């Protein structure tokens, strides 16, 4: 079961939380859901070069709060904040409500599954050898503190006549363990030979407390910690186990 299901959906309510955080009655639920989908697609398409990891949407009373997690926040903000004001206005027009926009920097894009998948897809589109792109991503993630990573690429790799799937794994990726903090991301590379699909799983350690916000809080705290501090935490968890 853990091998097939989306690892993020599998852990929702345990150590992961939803990217859309709001409640609505039956009459307006569908409309708000489609607004979320439109906003996410718009942000992902409009800010493709900014390295968007995820878009979190919250809806306090008759307002909308959008948090964009980006590896390159400077591209979103623009010169003297001009670009972010334009983006805020466009999102407000989509929701017909007051929209607040927050930008959160992803300090280590090498261990963010969505950004790793996007990076590999961009390399495949530039005709970089898929094995080299995958190995480079694996080495970077392990060097920056990931406890395990698995990458699969599927399609007409290298222009082959018959599509196939290749994968690399290093370290542990325990998909069945619910307390494991596993990040998952996908991307598509539009090559001259057709579309190649990329999937990335990154194991960042175990979360022992039962807290849906634990993974998000840990990511923010991890940006402030150095590698030595993370190693001490990992050793402490192993001793307790």
Curated annotation (Swiss-Prot):
This protein's superkingdom? Bacteria
Q: InterPro entries of this UniProt entry?
A: KH_dom, KH_dom-like_a/b, KH_dom_type_2, KH_sf_prok-type, Ribosomal_S3_C_sf, Ribosomal_uS3_bac-typ, Ribosomal_uS3_C, Ribosomal_uS3_CS
Keywords in UniProt for this one? Ribonucleoprotein, Ribosomal protein, RNA-binding, rRNA-binding
Ranges for the KH type-2 domain? Answer: 39-107
| Record region (Disordered) | 214-241
A Gene Ontology MF term for this entry?
mRNA binding
Provide a GO CC annotation, any one. cytosolic small ribosomal subunit
Classification via Gene3D superfamilies: 3.30.300.20, Ribosomal protein S3, C-terminal domain (3.30.1140.32)
NCBIfam families in alphabetical order: rpsC_bact (TIGR01009)
Task: State what this protein does.
Answer: Binds the lower part of the 30S subunit head. Binds mRNA in the 70S ribosome, positioning it for translation.
Q: Which PANTHER family match?
A: 30S/40S RIBOSOMAL PROTEIN S3 (PTHR11760), SMALL RIBOSOMAL SUBUNIT PROTEIN US3C (PTHR11760:SF19)
Q: Subunit structure, briefly?
A: Part of the 30S ribosomal subunit. Forms a tight complex with proteins S10 and S14.
Identify this protein by name: Small ribosomal subunit protein uS3
